[in-house]
């Protein structure tokens, strides 16, 4: 059941270990209440995809994921015909014995994620995750417009398949290119930023409960300072969690310069970034973090 208030939605998502920012909570709530797609844009690793996954668990709905990539077409995204089965039918019936109505049937139709999402089940309409739309070609966006506008797909040989109840749609983009305005207008939009220190601490305590409170504080504040550096790719929330878990595996109860340097590849994924931060720069950031935490304790 969809939450009655924004606060209730935030609390429900938190019980599933997803911490919503205030802005994202409002956007998600409105998208659910108004049955509009939610377009989430932001850096990789900030938790956009997890919104759909967590929502599926919360509402006990099927999650249908369409992972976008360059060259994605209708056959992979929406439907295709079972040509092998059609050929067998033709061979069995004899040449010229079957017409289009005999061959282009529901039984010969192979459903891909977009078409599958238009079919609900006993649990209700599914959640459709269109992940990393910016990786797909612009032509694919045009195809999505009919679905997002009318909740239907037109199949030339078969007819129009319409949803009895619209799916819950979450679209994500890492903004490697701009998505066309025509598609954005059909959605509610939210930019997913890196979480605040307190929100990221909350996330880390939920996702890495084995890490002690002091270690979590160090990890989060170190990562936040790292994001202020001129890096090719700043670490996301996923990297924060991975780093805390890695440090626990190494029996670290606190970060020191040696452990920071030896595990930098968990946080950063480009050699130029690692080379720039490792050593004196990591030690400087760590000193700033320790000074900040000492100030909190003194206060």
Regions found by a protein language model. Give the residues of each.
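C-terminal regulatory/interaction module of P-loop NTP-utilizing enzymes
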Residues: 1-299
């Amino acid at each position: 059941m969809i939450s009655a208030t924004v606060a209730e939605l935030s609390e429900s998502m938190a019980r599933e270990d997803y911490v919503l920012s205030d802005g994202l909570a409002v956007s998600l709530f409105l998208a659910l209440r108004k049955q509009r797609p939610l377009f989430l844009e932001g850096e990789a690793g900030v938790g956009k995809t997890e919104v759909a996954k967590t929502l599926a668990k919360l509402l006990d709905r099927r999650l249908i994921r369409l992972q976008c990539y360059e060259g994605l077409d209708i056959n992979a995204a929406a439907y295709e015909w079972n040509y092998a089965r059609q050929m067998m039918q033709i061979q069995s019936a004899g040449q010229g014995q079957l017409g289009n109505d005999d061959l282009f049937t529901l039984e010969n139709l192979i459903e891909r994620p977009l078409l599958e999402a238009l079919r609900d089940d006993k649990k209700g309409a599914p959640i459709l995750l269109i992940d990393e739309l910016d990786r797909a070609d612009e032509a694919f966006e045009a195809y999505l417009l009919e679905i997002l506008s009318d909740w239907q797909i037109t199949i030339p040989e078969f007819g129009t398949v319409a949803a009895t109840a619209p799916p819950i749609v979450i679209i994500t983009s890492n903004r490697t290119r701009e998505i066309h305005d025509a598609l954005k207008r059909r959605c509610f939009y939210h930019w997913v930023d890196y979480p605040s220190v307190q929100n990221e601490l909350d996330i880390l305590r939920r996702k890495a409960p084995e890490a002690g409170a002091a270690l979590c504080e160090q990890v989060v504040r170190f990562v936040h300072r790292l994001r202020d550096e001129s890096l090719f790719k700043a670490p996301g929330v996923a990297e924060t969690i991975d780093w805390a878990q890695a440090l626990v595996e190494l029996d670290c109860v606190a970060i020191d310069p040696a452990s920071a340097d030896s595990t930098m590849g968990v946080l950063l994924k480009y050699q130029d970034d690692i080379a720039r931060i490792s050593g004196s720069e990591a030690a400087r950031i760590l000193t700033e973090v320790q000074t900040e935490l000492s100030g909190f304790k003194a206060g």
